Amino acid sequence: MAAPVRGMAVSSSIGNTTSFQKKTRSKLVFIPGTRPSVQNGQLLVSSGVSSLDYVIGGGLAVGTLLLVEEDRYDSYSRMLLKYFLAEGIVCGHELFLASARDHPDQIMQELPSPILDDVASMKMSEGQSQPNDPDNPDTMKIAWRYQNQPRVQTALASSSRFGHYYDASKTMDPELLQAAKYHSFYQLQETPVTTGLSSLPSPYLALLKSIQTLIQKEGFDGSTPQLRGRNVLRVGLHSLGSVLWGDDVCCKDNSAHCHALSTFLYALRGLLRTSLSVAMMTVPSHLIQSRAVMGRIIRLSDTAIALESFRGSEKETNPLYKDYHGLLYVRQIPRLNCLTSEVPDTKDLAFKLKRKQFTIERLHLPPDLSETVSRVSKADLAAGCASTATGNKHLHF
């Protein structure tokens, strides 16, 4: 009876050794200036504007393209591009800046100065509602039933801080600029590239090859093993689609290169998807004649926003918009590793440039508390109801 017991012990010990291994959480790549998304686990970087990060779902996903439709004078879209580049310098990311109008070195000299002290933490509390003070004589200016209602939160801010804050009234320290690893592409100084059978104009083809060479040479290609610490490449493309890039979509409706920018975006997104890089591109949409071309450009971008400046328009003198400098429209939100995207809680957005900071807020119009509202006075009613009403006074019912 002893032998079977030993055999059973041996067989039971063999049966206990299985190939089962406990599944552990995969290790995420840690890169300074990045964090994983809580929605889809995608690696995110900050755009340099915390309120813009909140609008587009927490930040820019690595491997994606952000399209910014320029305002009429390219003032605020250029500022967003500078915030995007400045955030890369503070986080230690590598930069690639391409331009055809202004030299990239000139744009780099205009980057805003970062705020690295404790004052930046106070920016998160701006725009928060304050409790109503019963002793304040201004608390009963509107109906009493609305007095205890919570005020509209105009400021857009996340519960956790991501990114840095910048002082728009100062430029970045030259020592920070010199320490940054920066690559430039100035179209007017580049040697023309033979297109051959390619449908791309020479400037677009040269720009695409320059980005591809940089990604492969500096080790940002995700398909190749990294020989050193991983980093993110930030690509800034200024005013693509303009005439200076050899494109004619801004000149006529039926342009000869109507598919040039679309083809360029196809190839660019292919490079971004397989590399640790993120791009921001500005396009003068108000100059592009064909709406179909602009629609293709938006659909070929992962994230798309548009800026409408009040400068030179009737809205600049409209008292309803006196606290803002323009409107922001969300054209497209990325859908990455999921079926649906995070929809913003509001589509009525406006931006303003304070003395030191560019912010995006909910467009909220407070109640009209002025005493000179457009209502008919009692004197007008009395005169209008009289049988001998004269002048511009009409009978009101």
Swiss-Prot record:
Gene Ontology process terms (BP): regulation of transcription by RNA polymerase II; tRNA wobble uridine modification
Keywords attached to this entry: Cytoplasm, Nucleus, tRNA processing
Lineage top rank: taxon = Eukaryota
- Annotated localization: Cytoplasm; Nucleus
Q: In which pathway does it act?
A: tRNA modification; 5-methoxycarbonylmethyl-2-thiouridine-tRNA biosynthesis
Query: Any idea which GO molecular function terms this record carries?
Result: phosphorylase kinase regulator activity
Family annotation (InterPro entries): Elongator_complex_protein_4, P-loop_NTPase
Q: Does the keyword Nucleus apply?
A: yes
What positions belong to coiled-coil segments?
none
Pfam (any one): PAXNEB
Query: Is Cell inner membrane a UniProt keyword of this protein?
Result: no
What is one GO cellular-component annotation here? transcription elongation factor complex
User: What is the stated purpose of this protein?
Assistant: Component of the elongator complex which is required for multiple tRNA modifications, including mcm5U (5-methoxycarbonylmethyl uridine), mcm5s2U (5-methoxycarbonylmethyl-2-thiouridine), and ncm5U (5-carbamoylmethyl uridine). The elongator complex catalyzes the formation of carboxymethyluridine in the wobble base at position 34 in tRNAs.
The UniProt subunit note reads as follows: Component of the elongator complex.
Q: Which family does it belong to?
A: Belongs to the ELP4 family.
Query: What is the name attached to this protein's record?
Result: Elongator complex protein 4
Biological source species: Danio rerio (Zebrafish)
Instruction: State the encoding gene.
Output: elp4
